[in-house]
Design a protein with these regions (language model features):
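N-terminal globular core domains of eukaryotic regulatory proteins
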Residues: 1-125
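Long, leucine- and charge-enriched amphipathic alpha-helices
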Residues: 126-168
């Protein structure tokens, strides 16, 4: 049985460390995060994560106003816009339009950002599914309420008939 010397294990571990370090945006002021542009920001998932965090802190009206500033002709601007609007209590139709627009631009999203984008997109899709389920539940509730009303009316009619028959 051969054992690997400890220094060989340590060397293997060191080889697995990433070559590039990423800037951390945890302390970046939310008021400035959207103004940061360039490849160093666009390819850094921590930048996008901080953007999501900052967008989540905005009031819905403020998020909508900020989103209007960003066009959606590049993946970066469309993603910023989508992130802002996702916190703005948008309608399912608006959410679907954002997802569709970003789907068109998603092949341009760099590999380091793609997993974060996919998680964000999955969350947006879940929000759409939730809205659809709520809609179905609402329709089912209305239909059930209508059926119950009909049954109550029938029950009352039958009771009235029973009372009439019993009196005779």
């Amino acid at each position: 049985v051969s054992q690997t010397p400890e220094h060989a294990v340590h060397e293997q571990f060191e080889e697995q460390l990433p070559e590039h370090q990423l800037a951390d945006f945890l302390l970046t002021d939310c008021g400035n995060i959207c103004s940061l542009t360039g490849q160093a920001f666009d390819t850094n998932p921590l930048f996008w994560l901080r953007s999501m965090d900052c967008a989540g802190r905005l009031a819905p009206a403020e998020a909508r106003a900020e989103a209007r500033v960003w066009p959606d002709d590049t993946w970066q601007d469309a993603f910023k816009r989508g992130i802002l609007l996702s916190s703005a209590k948008i309608t399912p139709l608006e959410r679907r339009e954002n997802i569709t627009r970003l789907d068109v631009l998603s092949p341009q999203i760099p590999a380091p950002v793609r997993p974060l984008y996919q998680l964000w997109r999955d969350g947006q899709t879940s929000q759409l599914q939730l809205a659809e389920e709520r809609g179905r539940y609402g329709k089912l509730q209305q239909s059930t309420d209508a059926e119950l009303d009909t049954l109550r009316q029938q029950q009352q009619f039958l009771r009235d008939q029973l009372d009439t028959t019993t009196r005779k």
